[in-house]
Amino acid sequence: MVRAELDKQPSDVRRMFDAVARRYDVTNDVLSMGQDRRWRRAVIAAVDPQPGERVLDLAAGTGTSSQPFADRGASVVPCDFSLGMLRVGKSALPHLPFTAGDGTRLPFADATFDAVTISFGLRNIVDPLSGLRELHRVTRPGGRLVVCEFSHPTFAPFRTVYLEYLMRALPSIARAVSSAPDAYVYLAESIRAWPDQEGLAAMVAEAGWRAPAWRNLSGGIVALHRATR
């Protein structure tokens, strides 16, 4: 069984993502019913990358989330600590500067980036607050943060249906399409244990970011948090 537990030991999380790398993008598309593409577009709009800006895309995986920044003329650095993900990404997008790095100890100097973003990865860092502080460290003063992460649906009846999907349907569907379906049991458990929108905004502020705010996507299944260095 290739999966991590909720204590999120880095070696377990790394092995889990190495195992799912080959079919990661396809599986995400199926499990989200295509919504992942909409969420990625929302991240790009929130970051609003300008030509020549330096953007860090942390937990970039295979680089699917990074390429749109390059398409807008930004200098994007996809960073991930799963070598399996990086290998798949480098094979598909050889022009991007894929970089191996731990979210709690980023291999970049202070104030390197104009904008930093992490999509569906903060939840997997062993210490999310440390991860947010590291992102703060490598961002220039006045730079911006965008976090796209699973959250808590705002409509109570829908929340009940969504939790049922997470805990029952999602792992079953993953068994049909993923190269490591047990990893998606961890996905469901980690989403259920993650803070709500207000809780994550408080964590962003505690890490030193200014004026954290968020907007909900897909009824709160996902929340897009923004803040300034």
From Swiss-Prot:
Q: What are the cysteine partners in each disulfide bond?
A: none
Enzyme Commission numbers on file: 2.1.1.163
- Per UniProt, S-adenosyl-L-methionine binds at T62, D80, D102, G103, S119
User: Does Methyltransferase show up as a keyword for this record?
Assistant: yes
Instruction: Give yes or no: UniProt keyword Zinc.
Output: no
SUPFAM superfamilies (UniProt xref): S-adenosyl-L-methionine-dependent methyltransferases
- Per its UniProt entry, what is the enzyme's top EC class, as one word? transferase
Catalysed reactions, as listed in the record: a 2-demethylmenaquinol + S-adenosyl-L-methionine = a menaquinol + S-adenosyl-L-homocysteine + H(+)
One GO MF term: demethylmenaquinone methyltransferase activity
Q: Name one Pfam family in it.
A: Ubie_methyltran
Biochemical pathway: Quinol/quinone metabolism; menaquinone biosynthesis; menaquinol from 1,4-dihydroxy-2-naphthoate: step 2/2
**Any single biological process term in GO:** methylation
What are the UniProt keywords, alphabetically? Answer: Menaquinone biosynthesis, Methyltransferase, S-adenosyl-L-methionine, Transferase
Q: Which HAMAP family match?
A: MenG_UbiE_methyltr
PANTHER family registered for this protein in UniProt: 2-METHOXY-6-POLYPRENYL-1,4-BENZOQUINOL METHYLASE, MITOCHONDRIAL, METHYLTRANSFERASE
Any idea what job this protein has?
A: Methyltransferase required for the conversion of demethylmenaquinol (DMKH2) to menaquinol (MKH2).
Q: What protein family is recorded?
A: Belongs to the class I-like SAM-binding methyltransferase superfamily. MenG/UbiE family.
- What is the name of this protein? Demethylmenaquinone methyltransferase
Q: Which organism is it from?
A: Nocardioides sp. (strain ATCC BAA-499 / JS614)
